């Protein structure tokens, strides 16, 4: 019987060495499996996606186009960053008083170094590695300091438990340049004792100089500290008789906070 010519002259058969080497080359790249963990979320890049980044000629041979491949890698990392970067994003926050507020953060959180990540990812795919890249918890979790500037009251939650509370006096609302900023911050360092100074004036003296026993800065020159010169804290004091921006605490409470505050703890300030 007449066998259709197409079957007789199949250009490439399954055991064709060229096809085998193309498959092998393709498999080398698509064997990679890279899992990223962002806080409680994970995402995996594997052969299902990588196979679409490869190019083949009309005979099914893998053509290595480095520019095209690196572009795919860069695009993938950019997409990860858009999805998971938290620095500079606004978060919804549930306050202890029962409100929902939106707080943005220019410092707290994390941000992918896209160039470095793309270079590493490209390397991992080409060496068909099975890796897990973990990034720190990107949400606030259940350990944080809540600074409610409208209530003039703060809370320190550790693993969901309220371990510290205090009234305070924040930046004076009568002066635009003294108002405490809303945002998400984190402790820079702590020092005991310290002298806090305002802006230096033309005659070489400072706008103010205050000696404090407990200094915990978290936003430029703004931080938590004891204010032994105040008799009262909380309420409406901050509206007209507030600080230069700092969170003034009763001395005993400042001592307790100084003792328990951890580096890296998110400090959520809002009105």
PLM regions: where:
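Active-site scaffold segments
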Residues: 214-260, 265-269
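Surface-exposed, secretory/extracytoplasmic low-complexity segments enriched in Ser/Thr/Asn/Gly/Pro
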Residues: 1-210, 214, 261-263, 269-271
């Amino acid at each position: 019987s007449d066998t259709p010519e197409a079957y007789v002259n199949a250009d490439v058969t399954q055991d064709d060495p060229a096809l085998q080497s193309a498959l092998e080359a393709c498999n080398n790249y698509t064997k990679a499996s890279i899992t990223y963990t962002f806080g409680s979320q994970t995402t995996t890049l594997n052969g299902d996606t990588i196979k679409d980044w490869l190019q083949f000629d009309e005979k099914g041979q893998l053509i290595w186009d480095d520019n095209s491949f690196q572009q795919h890698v860069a695009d993938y990392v950019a997409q990860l960053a858009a999805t998971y970067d938290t620095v500079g994003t606004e978060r919804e926050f549930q306050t202890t008083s029962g409100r929902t507020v939106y707080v943005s953060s220019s410092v707290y959180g994390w941000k992918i170094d896209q160039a470095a990540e793309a270079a590493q990812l490209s390397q991992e795919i080409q060496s068909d590695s099975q890796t897990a890249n973990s990034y720190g918890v990107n949400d606030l979790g259940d350990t944080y300091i809540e600074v409610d500037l409208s209530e003039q009251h703060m809370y320190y939650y550790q693993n969901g438990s309220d371990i510290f509370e205090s009234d305070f006096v924040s930046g004076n609302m009568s002066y635009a340049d003294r108002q405490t900023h809303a945002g998400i911050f984190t402790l820079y360092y702590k020092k005991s004792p310290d002298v806090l100074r305002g802006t230096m004036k033309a005659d070489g003296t400072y706008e103010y100089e205050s000696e404090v026993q407990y200094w915990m800065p978290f936003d430029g020159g703004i931080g938590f500290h004891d204010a032994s010169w105040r008799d009262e804290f909380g309420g409406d004091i901050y509206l007209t008789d507030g600080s230069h921006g700092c969170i003034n605490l009763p001395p005993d409470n400042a001592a307790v906070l100084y003792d328990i505050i951890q580096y890296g703890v998110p400090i959520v300030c809002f009105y």
